[in-house]
Amino acid sequence: MSADLQETPKAGDASLERLEQSVLGFRRLSNQLLAVIVTIGGLGFTLTCLSSYLGRDLLPIGSPSSLLFVPQGLVMGLYGIAGLLLASYLWAMININLGAGSNNFDKASGMVKICRRGYFKLISAEFPLKDVKAVKVEVRDGFNPLRRLSLRVQGRRDITLTRVGQPLPLAQLEQDGAELARFLDVNLEGL
């Protein structure tokens, strides 16, 4: 999976009874770096607008006070507001850790539970293990690559198990898919 696999064997039994997989959400280093860069850019444009309006240099580099406020300063202010709004959205998504969750497969209870954190609530799907027909691996290369691991469930659409974002390495995707298919005792499709 895209995150740590924690397998919990049942006490007194050599076989695995439970498989838990945590899924990484929006709180990734790449998203945090992007939010920092957008915040700095938005503040820079906003301070340039204010410097142009007040006639004083508020930034240590350049001389934004020499810009005319009406055409250039005003446009810089609009860019600054747009940048700060985008940065606020990114920081809010990082704060709530959108998309984080877990995949729980429990042979003892015969249930699969998939949980993800949504915008305003926890999204959860539960279904019987016997309804799982296969583990599906999807690989598409090109401009917008796709490497996804999903469950094929009877009477439902395919349920994605991997995180959204940067594609997983192919070897890790194959290994995780084979491990899950072996645990669930179902076929591995798509390879």
Swiss-Prot record:
It holds the Pfam family Ycf4. The keyword Membrane applies. GO terms for cellular component: photosystem I; plasma membrane-derived thylakoid membrane. It is found in: Cellular thylakoid membrane. The chain crosses the membrane at residues 33-53, 74-94. InterPro entries: PSI_Ycf4_assembly (IPR003359). GO terms for biological process: photosynthesis. Its main location: membrane. Seems to be required for the assembly of the photosystem I complex. Belongs to the Ycf4 family. This is Photosystem I assembly protein Ycf4. It comes from Prochlorococcus marinus (strain MIT 9303). The lineage of its organism: Bacteria, Bacillati, Cyanobacteriota, Cyanophyceae, Synechococcales. The gene is ycf4.
